């Protein structure tokens, strides 16, 4: 059968039944198993489907596969409520119709139990059974219920069989559609895009997109019930436990769980399997008997609400009030031979068993354990509500201020002998719960910060601050004092600014943060101004007096010593001095080093050490304020060697460090009277040797250096100087953007730039008093993140720099050094492949890498990277370090692919800048006043007809639009091909086509 005949059959819905009868014809088996058609029960939909498919065949398909995924998933989300309602109706059929409905379990929120007609399922089962060997080894219902891992299916030959996978996804798609038009459309368009080899794999990708979209659509409950609150409503007794495992420290202030991301993670190279309840209870009893040294027989096991009245010592060593607190522990009632266990998991377990008439909801006998079904588990580990309820009381009992992550149920060499204790390791609080490990042996629960720095939206930077910021960046770009070494910079300060306070402040800063303990002690003994020691003669003399053996190699040439301060890391310091003598800003940067120095803040304490990238001193009429860069790293002192702690100096580069990244253009008010703007001037370091975490460290709240931060008002974003600054090819703001994008992009599936701030704006208008950018859905006072603004408007030069950076580093992560030879750089998102690439192999390789390959199991995180040290891949023997570099740049390549669209703000900025040039000629308005809808002005200002239509369509002024079109003579065909119009306005365009034809040129 030719391809044209296939399409003809698909488009003709009357042939559906005839195609299904071909199943008995062995010569057509391949066609039957490659193309699965729907039986549309609602006959009234057939004309609409027929017309839709005919139009699709005749039209050129322009939508990419990734966009098609979004289209299908959005369609199901739009009909989600209807699907749930129909599913519930099927579940509540009357007795006469009940035999026609069967129940299928899925992982889709709200549709965990799908009720479908038995006739339809029997048809699918019949097709599935065409391969008798696979159907016997992997029963269809077991596969749907997730009892087999991907690796097992692959080894069994199921993964590569195109006559099976379409059916597995078909059962979901059919039942989801429930007779809607989308059922037939999915498979028609799918066959149009693909061949029979990649048909099944792309179908699974569509299924994945649908499920993920529904999960995003179904939001979890805001008010979560913790274990402490839940047991109040549960009819369980209360027993005082003398020797508890763990005491829940219920905090007084409300715990904001919304700031954290909670997810279940599997251990390295382990399958996602929960232990059945019957096996788990047997192991639980045996383990408790060993730990508590119980020799007497046990007849019953039950759940109890355990509490203690003992005095509890808090995390900071303070005694907490002697009150009743919930605990994790066990209590043996010798009279009844009952083992009572107090643990959140047991509360859920006995509730579940009571629903199945096993036990009384509080306890059960050991004989009843044998009655528990073999496939019954306590709950699905990926149930967000259950995870939140379980982890919440533990999170409330630990100090999270100095730790960016909590790993509950995670056992390491450090805490494997310290059960039920939070152990701080490399910035993480790891908690080993043996009871949790019994029910979920291959999982642990990971809790991490889900928000960035908590900046108050009440603090807004106004137009003047934006203008000052632009001037500051411009001055730094034009500064002639850059590229100085530190000694030259100090001499400039000494000669030009001796009378102001920034000179001594700078010297104190260097001594306190960049010198060893011995040097600082020597300076204090001499009782000389700290800044004097940084002049040439003083530090040369000091080198000769102190540490002669260690520093002798630096004294071989006097000129070499002249360019050094105390630490060799000061090589190539960049120095900027902006402003005049009375009002100036001193900026010192160290772009070519990796500084890890101590930062002792009075509120920060000894929890960690702050790494300084640059130092800023602002001096205004003698009033000095200083701070370090907004971007910072934090490493725990517990991982530093003891000699280093004693000296207080720099750590070894081989020491494991945990780094926090928070790069944002934030307006920071320092402890002085000056508001300064910090500009990050780094392109990006080699991040692969560290444990990365893009998470809110919240140091702004705890540091005495920073008082507060603020967002930028959307009304002040449209600034002529700032737009011009962004367009400059090599400015420090673009370099700043390259750095933050590289550090921020840590998601496996990076969110699309479609959600950026400016795309949501529905109206662009110019006010008479001030040209501002106003959101059509919110007021002009709404605060937005300035980072999002820059990301949405950065120039093409940034993209070029990204491409060049990736090209330079290509040797670090070439495909030949990876686990397979797939050219991942051309993958990006599905559908963006070069000619000749096997799509099915790419998808399969990606799936294997991210789900079963040792190098990819840790990629399944959503906000940060978490890596193990000295980890070697068992398959490719490639270091994990190299794979991280590869993945980081792969994300970067995706960024390049997604930021090439031009936003509407550039259209408006072109309008503004061009109008300024013509304003004097026309003499019609001032700098901030002009008529947007003056056709004569528009014709001269805007560069193309497309710009006119874009602006007018966005303004929703239909009458003016028709007048302009009629005057400038835009043809209907030209209008139809205009790009850059938002999706919301596509409806407007279609609605106006009939009217426009009457005024347009044919």
Swiss-Prot record:
The protein here is known as Uncharacterized protein VP5
Higher taxonomy: Viruses, Riboviria, Orthornavirae, Duplornaviricota, Resentoviricetes
